[in-house]
Amino acid sequence: MLPQQSRMRSPEEFKRTLRSGRRAGGATLSGHLLLASGQVPTCAVPKVGFVVSRAVGSAVVRNRVKRRLRELMRGRIASLPGGCLLVLRAHPAAAGVRQADLAADLDLVLGRLLRRQVGALRQ
């Protein structure tokens, strides 16, 4: 379970991150990362939100995918910059993959997002 201060809750945060954040995708999920650039971050810790649509499966399957993603992010939240907002969107393929494959795809997406964000800040 993610700490409460690391959970994205407000629809405004989701909307802003999905519209303005950098996007990177993998086979089972895609991510949107928004850094608090040029302004004071609203919080010192990164916030993570999850989007798992009905296309992924039934409510039981969607909740299982969210639980798996939350558990994987719990160990990786420290690698995110403070004050950033991250939205992870699960693809339908996420329901049928092993935990190790989902973890590898998450690492791939996070690596791409962080490289793109650092590159954008340098410009």
Q: Where would I find each of the regions flagged by the language model?
A:
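Positively charged, solvent-exposed patches that mediate nucleic-acid binding
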Residues: 1-123
